[in-house]
Amino acid sequence: MRGLRPALSTFLFLLLITGGVYPLLTTALGQWWFPWQANGSLIREGDTVRGSALIGQNFTGNGYFHGRPSATAEMPYNPQASGGSNLAVSNPELDKQIAARVAALRAANPDASTSVPVELVTASASGLDNNITPQAAAWQIPRVAKARNLSVEQLTQLIAKYSQQPLVKYIGQPVVNIVELNLALDKLDE
């Protein structure tokens, strides 16, 4: 019975710290230092939320740049179904999926002259990735240019404008946020 009081006191103290103080402190610091990120990095147009800069969207039309395949197949880019998605390299099912994706991309992009970029046929670890390389975006330019009646030069400039360089020059690679790029495409039509 003598050991119950210190154990209960320790439990209540840790419950207060880990269940109250720590979450409130991290929430307050996040809101103070990173308010846009702490609130989901939402992309707004007026009062309308168009998406998040952190989660891809399912752009399927020929007039849009397509991102990486979503691992959440039933409802693409569903964050509630996020999780590990890639099959092992030795799994024959992966070969079938990639072959089907390559065939679909080739059919949708008949004017593309080089091989299909790897990130357009492989899902990311979360299945929600919103970024592709500028080269993968450039590969899709002929299809998007034809569908939107835009020049290759206009789309090349748009990709360059929305390309983000890595924080450290030699670590990582440049990426293009597909959500922001496609929203910018829609603004060109206005």
UniProtKB/Swiss-Prot annotation:
The system is composed of three essential subunits: KdpA, KdpB and KdpC. Disulfide bonds: none annotated. Belongs to the KdpC family. Part of the high-affinity ATP-driven potassium transport (or Kdp) system, which catalyzes the hydrolysis of ATP coupled with the electrogenic transport of potassium into the cytoplasm. This subunit acts as a catalytic chaperone that increases the ATP-binding affinity of the ATP-hydrolyzing subunit KdpB by the formation of a transient KdpB/KdpC/ATP ternary complex. HAMAP family: KdpC. It comes from Escherichia fergusonii (strain ATCC 35469 / DSM 13698 / CCUG 18766 / IAM 14443 / JCM 21226 / LMG 7866 / NBRC 102419 / NCTC 12128 / CDC 0568-73). The gene is kdpC. It comes from the Bacteria. It is a single-pass membrane protein. Pfam families: KdpC. GO terms for cellular component: plasma membrane. The keyword Transport applies. This is Potassium-transporting ATPase KdpC subunit. Keywords: ATP-binding, Cell inner membrane, Cell membrane, Ion transport, Membrane, Nucleotide-binding, Potassium, Potassium transport, Transmembrane, Transmembrane helix, Transport. The chain crosses the membrane at residues 10-30. InterPro entries: KdpC. It is found in: Cell inner membrane. GO terms for molecular function: ATP binding; P-type potassium transmembrane transporter activity.
